[in-house]
Design a protein with these regions (language model features):
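Bacterial N-terminal signal peptides
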Residues: 18-26
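Compositionally biased, intrinsically disordered low-complexity segments enriched
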Residues: 1-18
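Beta-rich carbohydrate-recognition modules and glycan-binding surfaces
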Residues: 2, 27-205
């Protein structure tokens, strides 16, 4: 019996000592969970590949307007130019389809230069209400020099034909396309050049 009691006491002492030693050594007795790495940024458009997505112009002619926009991809750059006419419309845009998962990202980044007029970037997740597609846009400024502009998803404003609507948050895991608009209420020519469009957040510095 005495031998058995000694063994029990030794086991108890060991059980008490082992956790204490682990704490002193800086080792946790609980399982250590390594956090998952954040998703890497994704390039949506680089304008330097043969299989680059096609960009389509949508003018305000669909509303009886007279604005005219033109788009071309050349020398690794998208160029969106034209003339805005505010009467009976007052907008022109270019859009491209790109199915991509941006879950875990904060927003999109564009490297742009232009004529100083403000533009808008649109991110489409295919959300519709009352049979209409919801447009989610945010303004971007341009200067004559190349500048990098970041647009957080939280800055996107949900509208239908320019009128604000209540809508569910952007479904960042199911992005369907990107658009660029000019609708600043001023007649005249415009120019926008885009070097790239990509996401940021996650591992982006």
């Amino acid at each position: 019996m005495r031998v058995r009691r000694l063994r029990v006491r030794r086991l108890r002492v060991r059980r008490l000592l082992v956790p204490s030693l682990l704490v002193l050594l800086g080792v946790s007795a609980r399982p250590h969970h390594v956090p998952m790495p954040a998703p890497a940024p994704a390039t949506l458009f680089a304008f330097d590949r043969a299989n680059e997505a096609e960009w389509d112009v949508v003018n305000d002619g669909v509303m009886g307007g007279h604005s005219a926009g033109f788009v071309e991809v050349t020398e690794g750059t998208l160029r969106f130019t034209g003339t805005l006419v505010t009467q009976d419309g007052g907008f022109t845009s270019v859009r491209a389809r790109r199915d991509i998962d941006l879950a875990g990202q904060t927003g999109i980044e564009l490297r742009v230069r232009g004529s100083g007029r403000p533009f808008e970037v649109e991110i489409d997740d295919g959300t519709r209400t009352y049979g209409r597609t919801i447009s989610r846009r945010a303004p971007i400024a341009t200067t004559a020099e190349w500048t990098t502009v970041r647009v957080p998803f939280s800055a996107l404003r949900s509208t239908i034909f320019g009128r604000a609507v209540n809508a569910a948050p952007l479904d960042v895991a199911h992005i369907r396309g990107v658009g660029l608009y000019i609708a600043d209420g001023k007649d005249g020519t415009f120019r926008l050049e885009v070097d790239y469009i990509r996401s940021y957040g996650g591992d982006t510095p």
